Amino acid sequence: MVDPAPEHPYPDGHRPDEAPAPHALLEPVLGLLGSWYGRGEGGYPTLTGDFGYAQELTFSHDGRPFLRYEARAWLLDADDAPLRPSARECGWWRLQPDGRVEALITQPTGIAEIMVGRATGNTIDLSTHEVALAPTAKKVNATRRRYTLTDDDTLTFHHDLEAVGQPMQHHLSARLRRRG
Amino acid sequence: MVDPAPEHPYPDGHRPDEAPAPHALLEPVLGLLGSWYGRGEGGYPTLTGDFGYAQELTFSHDGRPFLRYEARAWLLDADDAPLRPSARECGWWRLQPDGRVEALITQPTGIAEIMVGRATGNTIDLSTHEVALAPTAKKVNATRRRYTLTDDDTLTFHHDLEAVGQPMQHHLSARLRRRG
């Protein structure tokens, strides 16, 4: 027999003008709040050829000075039809009083990454502070990420990767639109 | 102007008998799938007194050999009323062919932890493999966790912590019921 349970008393907000009021430190990243959907391309020397993918991103908050972050991608075939589930990420973006961002991002591939950076205007640049790897994870040394709000409803994303013996180089780029 | 976007083509399953079919490696942890709600107590020498909290846990999967994990807690006052949002966690539990579990768990407090362990019968024991800390995070050295399905609809949770100069010791324990 299962129990009915109360609704969570502190649901996340997904818009700056929605309860709960965003923490003041979130000001530089308020434009990210919400859900995003779009397309991207990726490649890496150790992968067999480039690939196209679709992606959902969600940023929310609960009134404290961090964003909840989740990303889900799926590969697309030559006809742009879904092929299979692909990269997933979740974590937290902590905003510091001096405007720095500390992003904790984990992936089911066994990678837990702590990135640091800053939100400058409409761009957030992040680079690796520390990477922790699960015992069976592939070797990832470092990554660089750039998120840019090119307008209120368009988010571009570029991701460079240094892994599996390869130097830092382009891995993914995507253009996402705010979901209605 | 925002775009309507297609539904995600690979939604997570929250029950063993629901699509998508769970990966065979998830067999030892199928009992965790779903949402859980319950109460817990916590304390630590560096905290001012013990505390009561309520917690939601969610385990889901997308057909691959890992669970998506999310936990949200909120503190309760002396009258058992919600006081404020508290600990949050998200991450992934990777199941290995030999039955080992690799759990990646991040917290908005700036902690990214990789734990390893095993599911034995109805109990999953995890201990720290590696901890990565955000530059401004408090110092956490290691943790130990035990999740036990005492019956199909009841999950107990014990969490020991070695942090901020204190030796490994009890930190949290909770009893959760499956949400209807």
Curated annotation (Swiss-Prot), chains A, B:
Motif window: GXWXGXG: 34-40
Region annotated Disordered, chain positions: 1-21
Sample GO molecular function, one term: metal ion binding
Catalytic activity: peroxynitrite = nitrate
Biological pathway: Nitrogen metabolism
InterPro entries found in the cross-reference section: Calycin, Nb(III)_bact/plant, Nitrobindin, THAP4-like_heme-bd
Domain of life: Bacteria
Residues reported to bind heme b: H171
Biased composition (Basic and acidic residues): 1-20
Catalytic class of the enzyme: isomerase
Enzyme Commission number: 5.99.-.-
Reported cofactor(s): heme b
Cofactor note: Binds 1 heme b group per subunit, that coordinates a highly solvent-exposed Fe(III) atom.
Record key words, sorted: Heme, Iron, Isomerase, Metal-binding
Pfam families with a match to the protein in the record: THAP4_heme-bd
Domain notes: Forms a 10-stranded antiparallel beta-barrel structure able to accommodate a hydrophobic ligand in its interior. In fact, this fold hosts the heme group, which is located in a wide surface cleft.
Its job: Heme-binding protein able to scavenge peroxynitrite and to protect free L-tyrosine against peroxynitrite-mediated nitration, by acting as a peroxynitrite isomerase that converts peroxynitrite to nitrate. Therefore, this protein likely plays a role in peroxynitrite sensing and in the detoxification of reactive nitrogen and oxygen species (RNS and ROS, respectively). Is able to bind nitric oxide (NO) in vitro, but may act as a sensor of peroxynitrite levels in vivo.
Family as reported in the entry's similarity comment: Belongs to the nitrobindin family.
Subunit organization: Homodimer.
Name of the protein in question: Peroxynitrite isomerase
Organism: Streptomyces avermitilis (strain ATCC 31267 / DSM 46492 / JCM 5070 / NBRC 14893 / NCIMB 12804 / NRRL 8165 / MA-4680)
Lineage: Bacteria, Bacillati, Actinomycetota, Actinomycetes, Kitasatosporales
